[in-house]
């Protein structure tokens, strides 16, 4: 394992147009540690972190900033020098480096970052407990049929979590986020997007299976 300023890098993947990393923020377990690492980050990230009331939220926000900072080193940049702007649907970008695209995600004690030279979206989720409302919100009819054909609850939970992270990453890569209606498109076994009710931009995907969690990255082209 590799450590950087209080986060533990647990997975990294280099793809054609981006790099993806997942880290644990468990070491950021005191207010003093979080305050110390915030001194390394941008005013925007510090303000965002301090808006969280609880230690867990602050650790995730600071950890996401640290992971982005770590990955920006590849380009000779530091997060503390970054200024951000926000797109129409709320997706942030690096104001002075439009050639670089990034996206962040967090779940429980994990943070994920995708950074590269194509529009990217990343999502990380711990394996979820299935609820019908989530299934209906997330899945197309054919995906629900595939889910119902599975024998074990464990297989169903993993399949659903994988599909959810793939769809979240895709929605974030397109910049539309939660405005994207997830049942309006399906993701096949070949990891290709299939538009069900409207034109949907093409993308490629990668899944990262972690212990009790799943991460996914989408690269729009």
Language model regions located:
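Core catalytic alpha/beta fold that binds nucleotide/phospho-ligands
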Residues: 1-221
């Amino acid at each position: 394992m590799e450590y950087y300023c209080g986060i533990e890098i647990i997975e990294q993947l280099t793809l054609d147009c981006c790099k993806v990393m997942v880290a644990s923020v468990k070491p950021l377990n005191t207010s003093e540690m979080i305050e110390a690492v915030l001194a390394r980050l941008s005013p925007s990230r510090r303000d965002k972190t301090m808006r969280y009331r609880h230690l867990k939220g602050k650790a995730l926000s600071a950890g996401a900033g640290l992971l982005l900072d770590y990955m920006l080193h590849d380009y000779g940049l530091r997060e503390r020098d970054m200024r951000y702007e926000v797109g129409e649907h709320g997706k942030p970008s690096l104001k002075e480096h439009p050639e670089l695209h990034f996206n962040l995600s967090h779940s429980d004690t994990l943070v994920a970052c995708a950074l590269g030279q194509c529009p990217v979206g990343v999502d990380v989720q711990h394996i979820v407990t299935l609820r019908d409302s989530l299934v209906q919100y997330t899945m197309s009819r054919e995906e629900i049929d595939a889910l119902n054909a599975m024998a074990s609850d464990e297989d169903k939970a993993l399949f659903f979590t994988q599909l959810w992270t793939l769809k979240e990453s895709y929605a974030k890569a397109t910049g539309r986020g939660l405005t994207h209606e997830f049942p309006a498109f399906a993701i096949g076994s070949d990891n290709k997007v299939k538009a069900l009710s409207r034109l949907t931009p093409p993308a490629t995907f990668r899944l990262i299976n972690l212990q009790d969690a799943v991460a996914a990255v989408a690269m729009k082209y």
